[in-house]
């Protein structure tokens, strides 16, 4: 597998949960769009969503992907475990958020992942996933993997 997309807590509710912030697309809509882009670029992609921190840590540790795209959702601000998992595997990842975390409540403005991420994309709604995948494909091509 080339790219793994991980979605954290409550992202299974996209399309229903606060559409004025997160938009109307479901996680399935986003995944289908990403799958098409990956297929058109001869890149393999897999998707994982969990509301449980330990399951996300396990998935990061077990991943054979060349690069990971992650929307850690609320765990962005609280999960030292997810941060440590990325440090342990020493694999590039792109942090993505549908909303601009720096234009939200004060407690949402600190990311425990941004400083160790390959790159970060905030505030472009579902299009942010497309931007992240394009950059992941660029990374794979640059590395010649």
UniProtKB/Swiss-Prot annotation:
- Chemical reaction(s) catalysed: 3-dehydroquinate = 3-dehydroshikimate + H2O
Which residues of this UniProt protein bind substrate?
A: 71, 77, 84, 98-99, 108
Annotated catalytic residues = 22, 97
| Keywords annotated in UniProt | Amino-acid biosynthesis, Aromatic amino acid biosynthesis, Lyase
EC class (word): lyase
In short, the EC number is 4.2.1.10
Pfam families recorded = DHquinase_II (PF01220)
Keyword Iron-sulfur assigned to the entry: answer is no
Pathway, per record:
Metabolic intermediate biosynthesis; chorismate biosynthesis; chorismate from D-erythrose 4-phosphate and phosphoenolpyruvate: step 3/7
Q: Name one GO molecular function term.
A: 3-dehydroquinate dehydratase activity
GO BP annotations listed? amino acid biosynthetic process; aromatic amino acid family biosynthetic process; chorismate biosynthetic process; quinate catabolic process
Site location (Transition state stabilizer): 17
Q: What family is reported?
A: Belongs to the type-II 3-dehydroquinase family.
**Subunit record text:** Homododecamer.
Question: What PANTHER family does the record point to?
Answer: CATABOLIC 3-DEHYDROQUINASE
- What is this protein for, i.e. what is its function? Catalyzes a trans-dehydration via an enolate intermediate.
Q: What is this protein called?
A: 3-dehydroquinate dehydratase
Instruction: Give the species.
Output: Francisella philomiragia subsp. philomiragia (strain ATCC 25017 / CCUG 19701 / FSC 153 / O#319-036)
Q: Identify the taxonomic lineage of the organism of origin.
A: Bacteria, Pseudomonadati, Pseudomonadota, Gammaproteobacteria, Thiotrichales
